[in-house]
Structure formats: structure tokens, C-alpha cells
Amino acid sequence: MKKWMMIVMLCCGVLMGCSEKTYEPREIVSETDVCKICNMSIVHNAYAGQIALKNGDYEIFDDIGCLMEYIEANGEGEIGAAFIKDAAKNEWIDVFNAVYVYNKDYWTPMNYGVVALDSKEAARAWMTKEGEGQLLAYKDLQDFKWGIHK
């Protein structure tokens, strides 16, 4: 009987070890957080982004363009999760599932003109209020021309 209990406990331990870790966004501290790419202070939290690395560290960004530059340089392999602020709600949303809108006239901290929203409906509402733009998905951002847009 003890042998079977040990086997069951061992199996439970193995299964618990296989559970996927969950990652949560951390609070941005404007006084101390700086963008990993451009070293600017995170003054405009409504446009901030962050990557939770699998090792527990966080990389912070002041604009989606800087976050994407980091991913391009480092790949996605060590990313546990990535978050960007929803431009309409000022809430954290998943970078990989967000809907993006580009308009060269949208103001963003690094002048990339790309904002993130949680749905196509929210993106359309944003464009109605702020001016027409180009709808983009995460995969589109990977090929986007990220220079500072004028």
C-alpha cells in the first residue's frame, strides 16, 4: 500500500511540475522605470509595454515600437508573456492578441503612431474618435517599418 501511495504522490508531483506558469503584468513605477531600448522614463503609462521573461525578470518599454525592437533583437524564446496598455481603457492586454491601429498622426511617446486595443470593435471606435488608421495584428508588427514616423 505504501508503495502505491508513493507512486501516486510521485505522479502528482510530476504533473504539478508540468503545469504552465502564469505571468502577470507588474506595476510601472514612473519614478524609476526606464525603457529597455531608448532609456527614456516611462512618463506616459497609457502607452507602456512590458515583457515578463521566463526567468522572472521584466523588461519595460515606453512604446510598442520599442517593445517590438526588443523582440526582433532577442526573439520570443525567453518570453513568458508580453503586455501592452490598451489605449482606450489604460489596462494591460496581451501583446500577441491585441489589435493595433497605425496612423502617422497618432501621438505616442516615440512617435511610432501605433496604439493597441483589445478588439477590432474597440479599434474601430478609436479610429472614429481619433482619426482613421490602418488595422494591424501582432504578425503585421513583425514586418512593420519601425523608424520614427513623421
Regions found by a protein language model. Give the residues of each.
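Bacterial signal peptide processing site
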Residues: S19-K21
